[in-house]
């Protein structure tokens, strides 16, 4: 797809026109019924002071520093939406809204406070603190980061997004349903009413054991991966929340047949 539209990583992470062009190519060339101009999980973390290696054509961006590994207070810049790594997404959404807003659904993407905490403190460090019972410490960090999620999501709606995917990686192989219920669910219930548009929660991996919790968090939809039993998900929470996804992107979508998909 990059070859077909003459746009590639890392340019598409850093330049709004390249970002919009690559998103549009997914619709015009591959036939996707949405355009989503964000390909990294590090747009916010770069704006918050993380050292990010933006990779190359064949590798994804990677965080190289954890500026709050000591769980020190996080002071969010007042102009965070104007930081280059976040501004580029807003500008790309505006470009797409002007050009194809009446033809195709435009999706935005933000990181939730749990994922942002991974980037600020380091994933292993953050989860270790939870395992050690330092719950006040991790909740404090997530609360300091929650305004970033809210502000970026609202700005994306204002820029032209029809819907925003909120990714928060409290996945089954990293945290228990109890941890989600006690630590993150209250924050999700608090932030969802503060965002002015439909939200899709994305959590990777096998989350069969927390579907009911997700359904009660205030999101319009849950985007789930192939490890979740789709029939089971529909039976248990399909009457409470819309369900999206369940296609294995690295195997079925990439190497499978149309019939497989």
Q: Which residues are covered by each model-predicted region?
A:
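Amphipathic repeat-derived elements
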Residues: 1-21, 66-79, 202-208
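Glycine-rich, proline-tolerant flexible connector loops at the mouths of alpha/beta enzymes
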Residues: 34-66, 72-82, 160-180
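N-terminal basic, low-complexity leaders that serve as flexible interaction/assembly modules and, when applicable
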Residues: 1-56, 91, 95-98, 140, ...
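Active-site loop segments of alpha/beta catalytic cores
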Residues: 1, 9, 33, 80-261
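Short, flexible, mixed-charge acidic loops at enzyme active sites
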Residues: 51-58, 62-67, 118-128, 238
